[in-house]
């Protein structure tokens, strides 16, 4: 389907080191990529259909950890360490549930980190609800992150729902929207650090 075309384009044409896919269905990495890429798929807690899952693919062998968010939504996040940076991906609950999902993941992310996925809320909706994306206090600093967005709609609804939160210690090079492919309702977003 379209997910396979997008995935293959990101791996071969764009040469992405890490690819995050949400709602990937019964995902299996094709034989053409075996040996070069490794992946992990996790279902959301309470999910009863094959769409409710998240996948992360990387061009190196890795051990991923799965985080069940303490946000009341039952969502899961996958983390892998790539060259010293902890990369998390998730598919947030729609609407106000996204705030709890993101807040919990930023709070527990191990620095330096990148969080990316289908946030199901626009950056302004999240930042309005979260004010400044930080955790902790003056005497006990927590994590802080900034939004890395392409500034364009990433969903066929015309809203920007797919973007990244980046540890404040990391520097963004680019964040761009890829081209849309038939069958999917989201555009791929490509981040370079």
Regions found by a protein language model. Give the residues of each.
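Loop/turn elements at helix/coil->beta-strand transitions in domains of secreted/extracellular proteins
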Residues: 14-18, 37, 85-86, 110-112
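Glycine-rich, phosphate-binding/catalytic loops in enzymes
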Residues: 31-39, 129-134
């Amino acid at each position: 389907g379209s997910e396979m075309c997008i995935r293959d384009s990101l791996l071969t044409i764009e040469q992405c080191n890490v690819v995050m896919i949400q709602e990937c269905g019964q995902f299996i990495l094709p034989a053409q990529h075996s040996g070069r890429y490794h992946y992990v798929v996790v279902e959301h807690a309470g999910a009863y259909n094959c769409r409710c899952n998240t996948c992360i693919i990387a061009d190196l062998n890795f051990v991923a950890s799965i985080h069940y968010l303490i946000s009341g939504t039952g969502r899961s996040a996958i983390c892998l360490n790539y060259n010293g940076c902890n990369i998390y991906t998730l598919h947030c609950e729609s609407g106000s549930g996204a705030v709890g999902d993101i807040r919990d993941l930023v709070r527990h992310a191990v620095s330096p980190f990148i969080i990316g996925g289908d946030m199901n809320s626009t950056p302004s909706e999240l930042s309005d609800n979260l004010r400044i994306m930080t955790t902790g206090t003056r005497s006990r600093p927590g994590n802080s992150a900034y939004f890395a967005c392409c500034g364009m709609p990433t969903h066929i609804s015309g809203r920007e729902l797919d973007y990244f939160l980046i540890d404040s210690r990391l520097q963004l090079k680019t964040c761009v929207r890829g081209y849309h492919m038939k069958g999917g309702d989201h555009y791929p977003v490509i981040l370079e650090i």
